[in-house]
C-alpha cells in the first residue's frame, strides 16, 4: 500500500508493514531529518494508534519544514483550517494512511511546537506566536469548524484556570502513555463544568489533545481573556 495522508471527518489510522522505503527512512532520519510515521501495534487500540500517529506526524512535519508549519499556524484560524491540505503530504508517512480532521492536524502541530518550546531557551526560540482571542467569538453564521474551535479553546481555558498542570500533562506526555492516561483520569471528572453551553459534538481524546496543544502554545504570549466586558 502506498503512503497516503487524508484529511477527513474521522480520526483513524491503518499502516502497512515496513518495507525497503521504511528502512531507508529510519537510517536517514538518524543523520538528516526526523523519522516518518511508522507504528508497530504495541498493544494499542485503533483509537490510540490514531493519536500516536498524529503526534508522530506533527513531530516529523515540524521537524522537516519548521518555517512552513510556523507560517501556516500564524494565519487566522479560518484561513488555516481551509488550507490544511497544503501540509497534508506523505513525506512523513512510511506506509498506509492517516485520516483525521483538519482542526486536529492543526492542533497537534501546535502541541508539537509547545513541547519543543518547553525544551528551548527563550532567546533561541525563533517561531512567532499568535495570541489567543477568547473575547471575540465567531459570528453565529461562521463556518462550523471555526465555531467549534472557539468553543474548544474556551473549554480549555476553563480547565487550565482550574488545573494548569493537568492540561500540560495531557500535551507533554506521549499519547496513550501511562502518564497521559493518569492525566486523563484526573481530567475527565472536571470536563462537565467547563463544556460550553450548546457544544454538541463528540469530545474524543484526539479532539482534546488538539485543543490543548493550540491553547498552550498560543498562551505563551498574553491571551485576551474571556469576559473582558463583553456580553455573550
Residue positions per predicted region:
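Extended intrinsically disordered, low-complexity coil regions enriched in Ser, Thr, Gly, Ala
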Residues: 63-88, 162-196
Amino acid at each position: 500500500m502506498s503512503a497516503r495522508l487524508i484529511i477527513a471527518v474521522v480520526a483513524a489510522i491503518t499502516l502497512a508493514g515496513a518495507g525497503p522505503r521504511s528502512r531507508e527512512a529510519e537510517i536517514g532520519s538518524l543523520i538528516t531529518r526526523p523519522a516518518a510515521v511508522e507504528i508497530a501495534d504495541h498493544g494499542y487500540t485503533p483509537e490510540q494508534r490514531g493519536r500516536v500517529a498524529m503526534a508522530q506526524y506533527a513531530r516529523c512535519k515540524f521537524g522537516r519544514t519548521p518555517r512552513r508549519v510556523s507560517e501556516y499556524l500564524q494565519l487566522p484560524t479560518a484561513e488555516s483550517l481551509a488550507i490544511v491540505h497544503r501540509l497534508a503530504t506523505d513525506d512523513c508517512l512510511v506506509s498506509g494512511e492517516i485520516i483525521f480532521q483538519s482542526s486536529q492536524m492543526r492542533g497537534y502541530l501546535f502541541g508539537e511546537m509547545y513541547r519543543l518550546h518547553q525544551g528551548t531557551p527563550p532567546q533561541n526560540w525563533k517561531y512567532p506566536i499568535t495570541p489567543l482571542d477568547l473575547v471575540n467569538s465567531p459570528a453565529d453564521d461562521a463556518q462550523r469548524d471555526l465555531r467549534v474551535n472557539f468553543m474548544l479553546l474556551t473549554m480549555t481555558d476553563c480547565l487550565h484556570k482550574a488545573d494548569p498542570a493537568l492540561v500540560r500533562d495531557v500535551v507533554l506526555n506521549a499519547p496513550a502513555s501511562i502518564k497521559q492516561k493518569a492525566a486523563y483520569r484526573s481530567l475527565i471528572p472536571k470536563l462537565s463544568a467547563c463544556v460550553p453551553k450548546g457544544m454538541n459534538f463528540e469530545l474524543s481524546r484526539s479532539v482534546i489533545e488538539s485543543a490543548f496543544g493550540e491553547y498552550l502554545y498560543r498562551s505563551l504570549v498574553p491571551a485576551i481573556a474571556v469576559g473582558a466586558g463583553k456580553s455573550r
